[in-house]
A protein has these predicted regions:
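Contiguous, well-folded functional domains in the mature portion of proteins
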Residues: 1-197
Length: 197
């Protein structure tokens, strides 16, 4: 679990950029070192803990895991957003599915069906089910997940990230009142996306 200001996957990028900055400073001077300092700052910003924009809210007739009528909330994460993923509810991972796919721009409507993706089906103690899917984009060519089947997650727990430009989809049953709409800005671990009616 990652509770720090930067997720652990980011430290290697930050450290590498700072190392190169030091090497360039002593080898070639300040002017050559500055771009690497800027790069380290960018990596710190990118891998911070967390945001995104609601790309769409779609009604579905059925979902393989949730079962029955449901609602899909699609959150687009640009290169400037945080690509850290958090569990929307406390529960056990009952289903996990990874699909190899394309790397189309994450804002395209068809990415949920065509792009590389990793889906988790989570069920709480009362039998309430949701699915959350990490979807890679044109720059995001690595989906990272630190959880697996049968793991228990707490609400808001960081469980993975998508590196550089992506989309996240959340599918909830129709008895959830969705509190966001297309175009809304959301922040991971803070914004409430829905409430059970």
């Amino acid at each position: 679990m990652n509770r720090g200001p930067v997720v652990r996957e980011g430290y290697v990028y930050i450290a590498a950029a700072l190392f190169l900055a030091v090497v360039m400073y002593f080898g070639f001077g300040v002017a050559v070192a500055v771009p690497f300092v800027v790069l380290a700052c960018y990596f710190t910003y990118f891998f911070r803990n967390p945001d995104g924009t609601v790309q769409d809210v779609v009604e579905l007739e059925d979902d393989d895991f949730v079962k029955g009528p449901c609602t899909k909330i699609i959150i687009f994460l640009s290169v400037f957003n945080v690509h850290v993923n958090r569990s929307p509810i406390a529960g056990e991972i009952k289903c996990q599915k990874y699909v190899c796919g394309r790397f189309r721009p994450a804002y395209k409507d068809e990415v949920g069906f065509e792009n590389e993706r990793h889906m988790l089906g989570i069920e709480n103690k009362k039998g309430f089910r949701v699915t959350v899917t990490q979807i890679a984009g044109i720059l995001a060519r690595r989906i990272v997940s630190w959880v697996t089947l049968d793991d228990n997650m707490s609400k808001g727990q960081v469980y993975g990230l998508i590196k550089f430009g992506s989309c996240t989809e959340l599918v909830v049953p129709r008895n959830v009142e969705v509190l966001v709409k297309k175009g809304d800005k959301v922040r991971g671990g803070e914004s409430v996306l829905g409430r059970i009616k």
